[in-house]
């Protein structure tokens, strides 16, 4: 399997990498949160742009991105607008969503973008091509905060992301039972062993799914999300606890 390298970080080998999400509604809070996050132990900074109030002002959005880049220059920066339909804070049109991601790509300030699989096939393919032309990696994602589909469907979605040339396919699902967590883990393992030619990220959410956030190295998930302050999704644990467990499992 090929790995993905962003700055000096190699994703897809060794212990799962830790991603933290920064959620701030204005530039002042972006600045203060960035200073607080700078001391935390993580690998990738995800900026959840759907929490930012002044979305219609692209200059304001990019000014905030510049603050993050300058405050933590060594950390890979993942630009994510999570749509309302997949659990995000704001609803915007597909056109606005694509334009926002294109602006991030063109800015030269971000290393990675999150692109939702179900945005529309043509728009997704075009945006991936645009990102790659600017040496920006694409995490292609799908989130279901209500249920966990069958393993075959999970694998089909991840394979579709791979066929669209996502650098890292990602899926996050809500379990209704412990067996749903096993479904996610089994699908992850099958994808990793039989189909994946690049790193994937998978997780089962809420308290029920916490094991999936810790056992990525065993089953084939290359990264996991931790919390510096407020969790960006149900079931996230603190980065310090997360690093401890990931290290124990890696060294066992």
Swiss-Prot record:
The keyword Lyase applies. PROSITE patterns: DEHYDROQUINASE_I (PS01028). The active site is at residues 143, 170. It catalyses: 3-dehydroquinate = 3-dehydroshikimate + H2O. Keywords: Amino-acid biosynthesis, Aromatic amino acid biosynthesis, Lyase, Schiff base. It is an enzyme of class 4 (lyase). One of its GO terms (biological process) is aromatic amino acid family biosynthetic process. Pathway: Metabolic intermediate biosynthesis; chorismate biosynthesis; chorismate from D-erythrose 4-phosphate and phosphoenolpyruvate: step 3/7. GO terms for molecular function: 3-dehydroquinate dehydratase activity. Homodimer. HAMAP family: AroD (MF_00214). Involved in the third step of the chorismate pathway, which leads to the biosynthesis of aromatic amino acids. Catalyzes the cis-dehydration of 3-dehydroquinate (DHQ) and introduces the first double bond of the aromatic ring to yield 3-dehydroshikimate. Belongs to the type-I 3-dehydroquinase family. This is 3-dehydroquinate dehydratase.
């Amino acid at each position: 399997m090929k790995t993905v390298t962003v700055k000096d970080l190699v994703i897809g080998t060794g212990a799962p990498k830790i991603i933290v999400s920064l959620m701030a509604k204005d530039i002042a809070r972006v600045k203060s949160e960035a200073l607080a996050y700078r001391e935390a132990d993580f690998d990738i900074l995800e900026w959840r742009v759907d929490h930012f109030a002044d979305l219609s002002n692209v200059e304001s959005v990019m000014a905030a991105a510049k603050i993050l880049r300058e405050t933590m220059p060594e950390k890979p920066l993942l630009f994510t607008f999570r749509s309302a339909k997949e659990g995000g804070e704001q609803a915007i049109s597909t056109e606005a969503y694509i334009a926002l991601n294109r602006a991030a790509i063109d800015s030269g300030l971000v290393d990675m973008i999150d692109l939702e699989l179900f945005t529309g096939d043509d728009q997704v393919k075009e945006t991936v091509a645009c990102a790659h032309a600017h040496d920006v990696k694409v995490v292609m994602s799908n989130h279901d905060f209500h249920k966990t589909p069958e393993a075959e469907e999970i694998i089909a979605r991840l394979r579709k992301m791979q066929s669209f040339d996502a650098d890292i396919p990602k899926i996050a699902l809500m379990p209704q039972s412990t067996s749903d967590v096993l479904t996610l883990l089994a699908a992850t393992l099958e994808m990793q062993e039989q189909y994946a030619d690049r790193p994937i990220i998978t997780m089962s959410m809420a308290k029920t799914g916490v094991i999936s956030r810790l056992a990525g190295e065993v089953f084939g998930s290359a990264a996991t999300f931790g919390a510096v302050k407020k969790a960006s999704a149900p079931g996230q644990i603190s980065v310090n606890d997360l690093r401890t467990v990931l290290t124990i499992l890696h060294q066992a």
